[in-house]
A protein has these predicted regions:
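Detector for outer-membrane/organellar transmembrane beta-barrel domains
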Residues: 88-163
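Outer-membrane beta-barrel "beta-signal"
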Residues: 207-220
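Transmembrane beta-barrel domains of Gram-negative outer membranes and organellar outer membranes
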Residues: 1-89
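Residues that define the transmembrane beta-barrel architecture of outer-membrane proteins
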Residues: 10-14, 31, 55-61, 79, ...
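Short loop/turn motifs that connect adjacent beta-strands in outer-membrane beta-barrel proteins
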Residues: 23-33, 69-80, 95, 112-115, ...
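Transmembrane beta-strand segments that form the barrel wall of outer-membrane beta-barrel proteins
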Residues: 1-3, 39-41, 81-91, 116-124, ...
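Solvent-exposed loop/turn segments connecting transmembrane beta-strands
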Residues: 6-10, 27, 48-51, 91-99, ...
Length: 220
């Protein structure tokens, strides 16, 4: 793309997340197979000069094998352990195509209204010819940690992501979220993001975002 896009700083973001259990008791009485799908769309709804385009849409299907666990570690209850396969792409052709495939481990802990999820991952290698973002792990990271606290129907979340590298390959992101009940299933939602990888097309750009909106359901 030779002509730079004339984009507004203010846009609308839609997120659709679905997750369901497709097989309970994969190994007799243990192990449940879940499949999920997440879609993020960034809409330049206020950009009337350029026909209000969708700036970016990212698609992320995944399959996860989860195990319930019961152990204690430093006063925290180990609740879940999982392993999954994840594909994320923006569905575009070169030179704007962005995608990667990962194997992701999930380890979850709970304690007194707090939940901590630790997710290290490994990127599945691609051939040099097909890889349109070979350095994506240095920006989107090699793992993240999510900390969630629930109280009085409200939920505060912190996501920390890191490349787990030093020097020029040291990049990451942080996101703070807050959701609270409004009416029925509607919840108010606010978020602040700083770092790399808020969307795939901008994976190697350091950016800051602040947003407010509504959500129908909360899950993580």
């Amino acid at each position: 793309m030779n002509t730079p896009q004339q984009l507004d700083n203010v846009e609308t973001k839609f997120q659709l997340s679905l997750k369901t259990k497709v097989w309970q008791g994969v190994f007799g009485d243990t192990g449940d197979l879940w499949v999920g799908y997440t879609q993020d769309s960034h809409w330049q709804v206020y950009n009337s000069q350029n026909s209000r385009p969708f700036r970016e849409t990212d698609y992320e299907p995944e399959a996860i094998l989860m195990f319930n666990t019961h152990y204690e570690l430093f006063g925290w209850d180990g609740r879940v352990l999982g392993i999954g396969v994840d594909h994320q792409s923006n569905g575009r052709s070169d030179p704007l195509s962005r995608s990667w495939n990962r194997v992701i481990a999930d380890v979850g802990f709970e304690r007194d209204g707090w939940t901590v999820m630790v997710r290290p991952w490994w990127r599945i290698p691609e051939s040099r010819v097909n890889d349109n973002n070979p350095d994506i792990s240095n920006y989107m990271g090699r793992g993240d940690m999510q900390i969630i606290h629930e109280w009085n129907g409200q939920e505060l979340g912190l996501m920390l992501r890191s490349s787990l590298r030093g020097g020029s390959e040291n990049h990451g992101a942080a996101q703070l979220t807050w959701s609270f009940p409004l009416v029925g299933n509607l919840r108010g939602y606010a978020e602040a993001f700083k770092g790399y990888g808020e969307s795939l097309i901008d994976y190697n750009h350091n950016a800051s975002y602040v947003g407010v909106g509504i959500s129908l359901l909360d899950w993580y």
